[in-house]
């Protein structure tokens, strides 16, 4: 099916969405969800118009429309993954939010070299026991592309990936930074099927995030990985100080790149970083953003990532009714997550089940087969 853009929401005959009554807005959103489910794409003007929606009741109406799209396009399986910080601290990059950057001397993040394959394998087994289906090896630094010729770290990572495949039932992923085409191919051959490399924010806002590398550097890395046949796990962070236009433009860039998985981190400010005094997002602002991402990316895996506990608090479950269909379980890179048992109980209470969610197109194709 060839996707066609949705018509703009605003015209001389159509008021701002915020001017609609709740019932009028619900009707409009129901129609919007149905058009997206049947294959139309959300254009930028309509997405920007959705950002005008304010007030808890109206935001929940937006979430309900996004949840309808999620159910139709992705089903009720919530993709569960876990991560391990295999090398921490003293990072060369100056990302404003990150406690691992050597540019933020006031932070107190742990600093250690590459973990042993045995340590990583033990954590992979623990992640599998907690219900995770994927396990991502995350390392600080700009990436293996810039490793010293004498470094053996990349080869050690490849060996660890092979060991995880041989000795567990969990799928290994990596988040190592920039890679060459040859390194991407080596990761693919070792068994890495998905790689995390976030855009963090829009191209326009990115200079506020980091200046030691560019947004385009990140895009090129994603293209290199996809050219090697590796799925892209690519998203960003909400709450860096970006505008609503930046959030929409990030989602549109992810759609253009055809990424498979979209982790949405909610900034949990870390002391000693440039954003250490930044206010956390309001939970309903986060919900609105999640819902808009789902409407722009109807078939993508959209993942609750870092900061969900700190930002959403008791409203975490609402994210799973606003378009989220994946979660990172266990601990994060430098902060603690909630116990996996609590996550599984939350899913069960919503009638959802943890597992491995389909990549874009798979669930729709499966549904079409079932209807024949």
Curated annotation (Swiss-Prot):
Which key words are in the record?
2Fe-2S, 4Fe-4S, Biotin biosynthesis, Iron, Iron-sulfur, Metal-binding, S-adenosyl-L-methionine, Transferase
CDD domains reported for this sequence: Radical_SAM (cd01335)
* UniProt KW tRNA processing keyword: no
Which residues are recorded as binding [4Fe-4S] cluster?
A: 91, 95, 98
Question: Coiled-coil intervals in this record?
Answer: none
Cofactors that this protein relies on:
[4Fe-4S] cluster; [2Fe-2S] cluster
Q: Bound how, and how many: what does the cofactor note say?
A: Binds 1 [4Fe-4S] cluster. The cluster is coordinated with 3 cysteines and an exchangeable S-adenosyl-L-methionine. Binds 1 [2Fe-2S] cluster. The cluster is coordinated with 3 cysteines and 1 arginine.
One MF annotation (Gene Ontology) recorded for this entry: iron ion binding
The pathway it acts in is: Cofactor biosynthesis; biotin biosynthesis; biotin from 7,8-diaminononanoate: step 2/2
What are its E.C. numbers?
2.8.1.6
Name of one Pfam family that matches: BATS
Show where the Radical SAM core domain sits.
Answer: 73-308
Give the reactions, separated by semicolons, that this protein catalyses: (4R,5S)-dethiobiotin + (sulfur carrier)-SH + 2 reduced [2Fe-2S]-[ferredoxin] + 2 S-adenosyl-L-methionine = (sulfur carrier)-H + biotin + 2 5'-deoxyadenosine + 2 L-methionine + 2 oxidized [2Fe-2S]-[ferredoxin]
GO biological process assignments: biotin biosynthetic process
List the HAMAP family.
Answer: BioB
Assembly and oligomerization: Homodimer.
PANTHER family recorded: BIOTIN SYNTHASE, BIOTIN SYNTHASE, MITOCHONDRIAL
What protein family is recorded? Belongs to the radical SAM superfamily. Biotin synthase family.
- Protein name, entry field: Biotin synthase
Q: Which organism is it from?
A: Cyanothece sp. (strain PCC 7425 / ATCC 29141)
Task: Please name the gene that encodes this protein.
Answer: bioB
């Amino acid at each position: 099916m060839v996707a066609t853009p949705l018509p703009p929401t605003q015209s001389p005959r159509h008021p701002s969405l915020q001017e609609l009554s709740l019932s009028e807005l619900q009707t409009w959103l129901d129609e919007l969800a149905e058009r997206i489910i049947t294959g139309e794409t959300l254009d930028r003007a309509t997405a920007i118009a959705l950002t005008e929606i304010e007030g808890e009741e109206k935001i929940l109406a937006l979430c309900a429309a996004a949840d309808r799209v999620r159910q139709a396009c992705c089903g009720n399986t919530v993709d569960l993954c876990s991560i391990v910080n295999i090398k921490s601290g003293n990072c060369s990059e100056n990302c404003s939010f990150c406690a691992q950057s050597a540019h933020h001397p006031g932070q107190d993040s742990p600093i250690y070299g590459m973990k042993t394959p045995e340590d990583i394998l033990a954590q992979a087994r623990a992640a599998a026991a907690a219900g995770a289906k994927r396990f991502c090896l995350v390392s600080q630094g700009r990436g293996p592309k810039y490793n010293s010729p004498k470094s053996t770290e990349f080869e050690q990572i490849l060996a660890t990936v092979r060991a995880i495949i041989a000795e567990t039932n969990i799928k290994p992923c990596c988040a190592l930074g920039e890679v060459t085409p040859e390194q991407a191919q080596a990761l693919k051959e070792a068994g890495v099927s998905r790689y995390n490399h976030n855009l963090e924010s829009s191209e326009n806002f990115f200079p506020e995030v980091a200046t030691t590398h560019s947004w385009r550097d990140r895009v090129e890395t994603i293209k290199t990985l996809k050219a090697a046949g590796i799925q892209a796990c690519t998203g960003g962070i909400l709450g860096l100080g970006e505008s609503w236009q930046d959030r929409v433009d990030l989602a549109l860039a992810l759609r253009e790149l055809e990424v498979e998985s979209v982790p949405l981190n909610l900034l949990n400010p870390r002391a000693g970083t440039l954003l250490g005094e930044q206010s956390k997002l309001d939970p309903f602002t986060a919900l609105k953003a999640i819902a808009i991402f789902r409407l722009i990316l109807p078939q993508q895996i959209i993942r609750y990532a870092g900061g969900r506990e700190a930002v959403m608090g008791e409203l975490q479950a609402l994210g799973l009714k606003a378009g989220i269909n994946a979660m990172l379980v266990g601990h994060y890179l430098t902060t603690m997550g909630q116990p996996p048992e609590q996550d599984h109980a939350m899913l069960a209470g919503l009638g959802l089940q943890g597992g491995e969610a389909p990549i874009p197109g798979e669930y729709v194709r499966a549904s079409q087969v079932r209807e024949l």
